[in-house]
């Protein structure tokens, strides 16, 4: 009886140890396999995002794949420059009258096409339901004109409203402007020539004292790099011209 009880205890202990081993194996298998796949995903996404900045954490914790994100992203400066593919309303008599009024009042603000819809009763679906009345566009332009007169002077073309290509607004082209400084002095340099608005360029260019370089000074010392002198009048030709003027 004693031997049988000892054998039973050994068998039960052996079975319990085997059960513990199986439980440990199942536990570590269920833990390590997901960790292994997560590590593979992290390595793959890290390899895909090495050429892009600040996207490692986003690629790891985001549910969307990197390829789908790259397909959804659009380079606004890589789109082809084509005609705007926008559906315009029917060009009715009321629309023509509204455009004529807007053109006469001078409130177009650099807009190429004034979008207004026809009056009620002419048929068709209202393409602009946000406008309450057909004259809402004119009222909006009048309000812009009031703000422009009484508010601060803002160059609307300088913030990109003037260049509209389809469904996006592009940044404006830079326009050169000069500082009120004589360009032919020795102090003039590349810092003299800035980028600004055209009205500043016109106003400042009137105050510039443009003069020819002296015959004794070299061209490189008298002119800044942006200018190219094609021909410099010689001293003899200048004296000859002055003598002819005195004789006449």
UniProtKB/Swiss-Prot annotation:
Keyword terms, alphabetized: Meiosis, Membrane, Transmembrane, Transmembrane helix
Bilayer-spanning residue ranges: 23-43
Localization per Swiss-Prot or TrEMBL: Membrane
Topology of this chain in the membrane: Single-pass membrane protein
GO cellular component: cell division site; cell tip; cytoplasm; membrane
GO biological process: meiotic cell cycle
Function: Has a role in meiosis.
Entry protein name: Meiotically up-regulated gene 110 protein
